[in-house]
Amino acid sequence: MREVIIYTDGACSGNPGPGGWGAVLLYGSHRKELSGFHPHTTNNRMEIQAAIEALRALKYPCKVKLYSDSAYLVNAFRQNWLRTWQRNGWVNSRKQPVENQDLWQELLEAARPHQVEWLKVQGHADVAENNRCDELARAAIAAGTQG
C-alpha cells in the first residue's frame, strides 16, 4: 500500500464568510498542491473540505498520514466523535443535529478506501507544509473575492 503524507488547512475571511482550503500531498518525490474557494462558508467547513479534496485526489487505496491544525477535524476521528454521532443518528451530546453532517459524511466516504492516521499539527508553528496549505487557502479566498 502506498504511503502518502497529506497536510490540509482551511481559512475564512469572516466566520462565516468567503473561505478557502489548501492541501499538500507528498508521495516519495512527488508533490501535489490543491486549493479551492467557497463564497459563503465557515472555517470548520473549509478544514473538512480540505481533507475531503485531498483524499479524493488519491487514485489508489493508500496508507495516509493526514496532518491538520484543526482540533475539530482531528478530534472527530481520534476521540471517536464521528462514531458516536453516527451511532446517535447524527445528534450530538446536547441532542442537537451535528453541524456539518453533510461534509462529515463526504469525508467518511472519501477516507473509506484508505488507512488514515489523523494527526494534529500546531497551527502557525513554522511547519513548512502546513504554512503552505494556509497560503493556498488564503490565495483561494483572494482569487475568489476579486472583482
From Swiss-Prot:
Can you tell me which residues bind Mg(2+) 2? D9, D134
**PROSITE patterns referenced in this protein's UniProt entry, alphabetically:** RNASE_H_1
Binding residues for Mg(2+) 1: D9, E47, D69
Q: Name one GO molecular function term.
A: magnesium ion binding
The RNase H type-1 domain covers: 1-142
The cofactor note from the UniProt entry for this protein is: Binds 1 Mg(2+) ion per subunit. May bind a second metal ion at a regulatory site, or after substrate binding.
- Tell me which CDD domains the record gives: RNase_HI_prokaryote_like
Q: Which domain of life is it from?
A: Bacteria
Q: Give a GO biological-process term.
A: DNA replication, removal of RNA primer
Cellular localization per UniProt = Cytoplasm
Catalytic reaction(s) noted = Endonucleolytic cleavage to 5'-phosphomonoester
Give the protein's cofactors.
Answer: Mg(2+)
Pfam families for the chain: RNase_H (PF00075)
PANTHER family cross-referenced by the UniProt entry: RIBONUCLEASE H1 (PTHR10642:SF26)
Q: What does this protein do?
A: Endonuclease that specifically degrades the RNA of RNA-DNA hybrids.
Q: How does it assemble?
A: Monomer.
Protein name per UniProt? Ribonuclease H
Q: Which organism is it from?
A: Symbiobacterium thermophilum (strain DSM 24528 / JCM 14929 / IAM 14863 / T)
Its taxonomic placement starts with: Bacteria, Bacillati, Bacillota, Clostridia, Eubacteriales
